[in-house]
Amino acid sequence: MNATAESTAQPSSAPGLFWKAITALPRDGSFRFSVKFGIAGILAVFAALFNKSHEPTWALFTVFVLMVAQYIGAIEEKSILRIVGTIIGGLVGYLLTAAFEQDPLIYLSLLGLFVAATNAMFGQARYPYAFLLCGMTAVVVCSNGMGDPGMSWEFMIWRIQEVCIGVLAVLLVQSLLWPRYAADEFLTGLRGAFIDLCDLFSATRSGTPANGVAIEARLNQLRQLLRFGGRESRYFRARIETYVELLSVISRIHGAIRPLTGLGLKNSFYFENAGQQLAGVQEAIEAQLALLGAPKQDSGALRQGSLAINTAMQALKQTIIDLRRDPRSRDVELDDILGISLECLSLEEIHQELARGLDLLDGLPVKIKKRHALDLRGLVPGMPPAFWITNGIRSTISLIAAMVLMNWVQPPGGSMMVLCSWLFCFLLPISPEGRGDQRAWHVVVAAIPCVLFLCLGLILASPLLSSYAVLNILIFTWMFVYGQVAYRTAGVSTVMNISMMGLVGAMGLNAQEPVSFQAIANVFFGISIGTVIAAVFQRSLWPLLPQREMRDRFQEMLRIQREALVSGTPSLEGVARLSQLPGEIKLRLANLVRPVYSEAEIQNLCDLLDHLDRFTANRIWESDPGQAKDGLALTKKIRELFAEILEKIGVSFATGRPCSVDATPLRAAIVEFDAWVLDARLQMMSESADPSVTTNLIGRAARYQNAATNLMAAAEVAAQLDTALYSKDNAL
């Protein structure tokens, strides 16, 4: 009877499940984003065609670029920068073409200098997108007006007009249809960060593997949302300083949790006698983190949670005081002493940061602050890094080569070829896959057949292209799929770049005019030849390769750690980079080519990264337990030995020579340091010092010992690496 009922109920539930899935789609973020992507594309092309624009493809290109920025604040910023960059770049392109087109040497030299400079400035922090659009618009105007300088003025006007149409289409769709506000998502992400901390703390307590990388990724995302949210709301902007401090609180809590991983107190004297009190503190902290991550925060409950942590901490301190009277406490092993002190220190730091975070939440400003006088120094662009300078020069050489080829040989699709040769050479190396230029020729081999199939399809479907219904279906479908990929990708991947140029090229076949075979051939040869030219210069001039990128990031990590040890504290930028570098290195490790890099070599690199990351987690530059003169001398000596080992590993990466580190002096210094710690503990016990003072000193000493263990392990692994491989170009 029951079986029969179940069998008859199952088919009838299928339509219900299908309907439930359909009705859930509008609540899915990727579906919403993809629908908006498609509608914005249709709207931009419709407006351009309705306006009888000469190049509706530029409006579509604008939609592709702007829609990737999913938040209102980000889109508004990029829209303004795109319009400003387009106007300036268009004027420069027009003036160069009108004045110097008849003198190719001067013309190409001036254009090359301008594009190289704007490309390089894309790599600094002040309105980089405007610089990119300056260069891109100058390239478009010059490549289209090269054969007819008198038309360059019209190309400039058309370009500006089409960009404005695309910007308006994106702003309209993003503002009216499921708008996403960075300010709102920041607050949601902030609560999510506390939930991540709660999960990490819980996993650390239970001894299960924990994903601390997720917290660093979320913090990086929150910093971006903070910037965009400030452009959306004056109310949010008034609270930015407090939100920055809250992100600092989250980062420091994460830093306090990390050293707790792998602590073994299961059978220690302190765990047996103070385990219940330790568990009480841990449970109170975990509950407070969960409250901070709740959708609706109750100020009263948070204050009660803070009081519960404080009560539990006092109970733990009293238990430790009572245990001092136990004669067995004087015979406890050093590892157990360091372990319990490290745990108590970390718990105390978490408690302090939680209290600070609660005060920040209670003290959020309600009134909007008055604006201060504008600091003009903040508007001056910075100096771009060396990579962006070389990348700008390289992509400009690719551009000039394509323009010379266009002028002398006049291949089909010349203007598309020029744009692709510059765009692919400049942007494909920084795609989020982390491969750089390693597979530039793979891209050529894959892209040409794909573009060929696209053009064959356009030839077969050319009668349908005059139908606006078919055109709209094609645009919406293509951009919907593109939106699905863009929603899940941090940045614009190689495949996304090529597919974008493919659709832009296809839409260049204006449906208001008969589509000829030659027009379709121009799309194929323009993209194909441009991809080949870009690949030639990608692989021959300063190629960006994952092994070199990995090597450089290891060197950067070692340098920041060494500078922090010498100066006593890293800069805010240095702290941020130390949190970002492990993820960037792992991305490059995944792209190392086998069998050039053996499995053992890659595993050693992973182990080295893990040891260096754990060394960072101990925050030695913030932990100086030496209070007496002899203690300060010992910690200074240990930090100098740390810096020496870090420097030797860095030199090995820089020179390609084997890493040779003698860890004997560090081991001897740690033994001497341990003896000093034991003496200092006994002295403080005899003086009945406050447990907070004792755990603070010995807990920081434990971090020194952990850091020494991690660094010596890193040196052993580094000695097994073939660092000469990381400077070579091993795979074309």
Residue ranges and their predicted role:
Residues 1-239, 344, 355, 359-600, ...:
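A transmembrane helix-and-boundary motif of multi-pass membrane transporters/channels
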Residues 193-371, 408, 412, 556-732:
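Cytosolic, long alpha-helical scaffolding segments
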